[in-house]
Amino acid sequence: MKLSFSLKNSFKLTALSSLFGCGLLGLSLSTSAQAEGKLVLYCSVQNTTCEKVAHAFSKKYNVDTQFVRNSTGTVLGKIKAEKENPQADVWYGGTLEPHFQARDAGLLETYRSPLQKEIMPQFKKLTEQRGDTTSIIYLMELGIGMNEKLLAEKNIAKPQCYADLLKPEFKGLIQYPDPRVSGTGYTILTTLIEIMGEDKAFAYLKELDKNIAQYTKTGLATANISTGAAAVDVGFMHTYVREKDKGAPVIGALPCEGTGYTLGAV
């Protein structure tokens, strides 16, 4: 699948989305899918984390908690499509901007978590202004992940910069999260625009497209670089640490041009 860069105007740097609830606590939501003793969770973090969150809530409150795991953009699309007949009670995880978009579209219930008072000082203003439907629950840094064993076998130097990924030796070796459906992909896009400027960022992505083996629907498909299905990935640093901890020859690098971060929400 190749991206159409005529979509440029749809990715202007505008603040997008939010949701409701906070952490594992009082996740009271929309007027819909609430059946007595049952809670449906749309989850945009790793599947294992979704399982742990659902289990912890079920155990603490004696509520049958079920989850559906999708990328941030996919969940936002589902919530929009289900506006007149909501199918879930809580949206847990995923990048903050799509949560704000849901808030601005009136898709979320008002709920301000009492835990917001514990937020890091630099995010207090944002929380005060837009925390009426969502809460920040984590922070993640962007980086370049790579299978160092596969790169060594191909005699390719480890990429340290976004610019390195344009080199011809990386043709067919890179996977990249599709910014149309992936919150990770959107965060990479906005970071590149911040670093390079809008026109240069889209020119960069058009050039990078020549080296892309596949566009993934989620930024969490890092198992592909562990198995060698891809040699290089652009995503969040913690995902590469997780693969390395499993024993895979995977490392991450913070791009030399600078990097961005995202806030996760519930």
Where are these regions (language model features)?
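Bacterial N-terminal signal peptides that target proteins for export
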Residues: 2-19
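C-terminal segment of classical bacterial N-terminal signal peptides
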Residues: 20-32
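Early extracytoplasmic/lumenal segment of secretory-pathway proteins
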Residues: 35-101, 223
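Residues embedded in well-ordered beta-strands
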Residues: 40, 143-145, 260, 265-266
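Extracytoplasmic ligand-binding site segments that recognize negatively charged/polar headgroups
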Residues: 44, 48-51, 87-229
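Generic structural signal for residues in well-ordered beta-strands
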Residues: 65-67, 174, 250-252
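A ligand-binding cleft/hinge motif common to bilobed small-molecule-binding domains
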Residues: 97-101, 231-249
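Periplasmic-binding protein-like
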Residues: 204-208, 213-215, 244-266
